[in-house]
Amino acid sequence: MLLFIILSVGVDAISYIQNDRSNDLCIVYEMTSFGTSFNNANDSLVKLHKHMGLKYEVCKIESNANALTQMQKCNCIYDDTPQIVVFTNFKKSSLKTLIGTENKCELLPQTTIYTPTVDIESEYFIYGNDVKICYLDKNLLGIGCDATDTTSWLDLDAGLPTNHALDIPEITSDGFKLFAKYSDSFLCQRLMDEPKKQIQFYAEVDNVPSNDVIESSRSWASVWKVVKTVLHFTYHILDLFYGNRRATARMIEHSPLG
C-alpha cells in the first residue's frame, strides 16, 4: 500500500477479512484545466469500462491548488488498488515526489516559528510555498540567521505561485527552524524511495516536470514518459491492460459504442 501519512496514527490489524479489490487501476490526472481534452479522454475510459470491464478510479488534481491535500481525497492512491498511472501537463508538478515515494508529512503552523524534531538519518523535504528555514548549525547555510528574526532566514521558495516540493539538505543533530507564510505547507520525512505499488508517470510533451526532489541529485534519468496529449495517455492505459494500442484506439474512436 502506498503510504502518505498526514497527521494520522497507524493501527496494526490483528486479523481482517479479505475482500476482492474494487479497482484494477488508479488514474491520476493533474491538469492546468479540465476542459474538452480531458472530457474526451474520460469518455473513452467510460466506454472501456462498459465494454471491457476495466475497473478504475479517476483522481483529478488541479495544478493551481495544493496537490497533497487533493491527494487525500483519492482513495485508490492509498487502498489496495495495485497500479497507479499519473498524467500531468503541469511542468512544475511535484507528483513524482508525492506519489512516487513513501513519505510521512506534518502540517506546519502558519506564521509561527517552528522547531521540528528530526531524525538525522532520514531525508526531508518541504511541500509548500513561501517557507523559510534557519539552520541551527553555524557551519551550514543558515550561518548568520537570527533564530528569532525570520527576515534573516533562508527562503526555500523558488518563486512559484503554487505549492511545490523543496529539498532540505544537510540535516544535522542541531536541527533547524521553519516559518511558513501559508496554512497549507508541510514538512515531509522520506520513508522509502520506492513505492509498494506499480506506478507509471506520463507528461504532456513540452511540459515534462523534474524528478523527485530528493532523488534528482542522485540520478538525471527522467521517470516521465512523454505523450502528445491526454488522449494519447488514455491509449497507453489501454496498452497497459490489452496490449494492442492501435486496434483498441480504433475501437474507441470509430465504433458507435454507447
From Swiss-Prot:
Signal peptide start and end residues: none
Membrane-related topology note: Single-pass membrane protein
Superkingdom per UniProt: Viruses
Subcellular locations according to the entry: Virion; Host rough endoplasmic reticulum membrane
Annotated keywords: Calcium, Capsid protein, Glycoprotein, Host endoplasmic reticulum, Host membrane, Membrane, Outer capsid protein, T=13 icosahedral capsid protein, Transmembrane, Transmembrane helix, Virion
Record field: transmembrane: 1-13
UniProt-annotated glycosylation sites, renumbered to this chain: 42
Alphabetized InterPro entries for the sequence: Rotavirus_VP7 (IPR008818)
A cellular component annotation (GO) from this entry: membrane
Family: Belongs to the rotavirus VP7 family.
Self-association state and partner proteins as the record states: Homotrimer; in the presence of calcium. Acquisition of the capsid outer layer requires a high calcium concentration inside the endoplasmic reticulum. Following cell entry, the low calcium concentration in the cytoplasm is probably responsible for the solubilization of the outer layer.
Function: Outer capsid protein involved in attachment and possibly entry into the host epithelial cell. It is subsequently lost, together with VP4, following virus entry into the host cell. The outer layer contains 780 copies of VP7, grouped as 260 trimers. Rotavirus attachment and entry into the host cell probably involves multiple sequential contacts between the outer capsid proteins VP4 and VP7, and the cell receptors.
Protein name from the UniProt record: Outer capsid glycoprotein VP7
Species of provenance: Rotavirus X (strain RVX/Human/China/NADRV-J19/1997/GXP[X])
